[in-house]
Amino acid sequence: MPNILTKKQAIEFLGTDEKIFDNYFKNAGEFKALPRQNNRGFFKFDQSELERWRDDYKWRTIELTFEDYAKCLDFALAQHFRGYVLSDWGTARQREFGQKITNWVKGQLAEVAVQKFFKNEFNKEVELDFKIYDDIVPQDIISVTDETGKRAPRIGVGIKSSKPKSAYLVLGENEISLEGRRSDVYIFCRPDMPDDHLLRLTKEKVIEAVQGQQHFPSYQDKMPDFQNMTCEIAGWCAVGELERVTSIPGQEFENGPRFVKKTGDLHRSREKWEELISQL
């Protein structure tokens, strides 16, 4: 007999929060509830299915070290100080420094995570491009090492990232419609990087600056330390498998359609990863 869990029990079993659970269940289709009579009543879940999902999630999740973070932060700062402008999707609003650096670091951490994932799980070495360019560079893997040595990839691979709660890989129309910006395959990652990473990095200096101030005692024991991060390699899809839409659950795209794939439909089994690696 299967062990049946309520939604609350399922959330506790997976050790996640309700918003992430709902996104993965309702929007992403990463796991299913048991059938309900006339689609009514409380959601219930088979524990064994959730366990399979959790185990699959764990083997695709990579630990990122301080050295990985430092490499990505260096790239982000180089981008910032060369005057590069990162705008919100489809708007002219510039993002403030903290958000801009955070987004760049997350993007690079995703690339490092894919590199480590390929090496750890499939013994495949790939090289990333951490150079700074004037134009957008669509391909994130610039070389592959095989029995003949180092060579250029046979296909273009774009590595995209978003927050852990994200249920969709989302790409702007120009990224797909313009041939010079399009990749053959997209890998989607969900790095779990705290928004206060810069505070964690500079904790000692911040304490030095504010200790003795009026409110310091109220938060001095709450300031977090820097810790290793994780990044889930959520899956991949070919460019032709993306869907052109004007909205996804909870979000209308204001400035034209986007190309998307919900994470539950991404390729993520070991066999599918081996298939992708054989194409590189």
Label the predicted regions:
Residues L5-K8:
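Residues within the helices of the helix-turn-helix
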Residues K32-Y57:
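Short helix-start
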Residues F42, R154-G156:
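Well-ordered beta-strand positions in beta-sheet-rich domains
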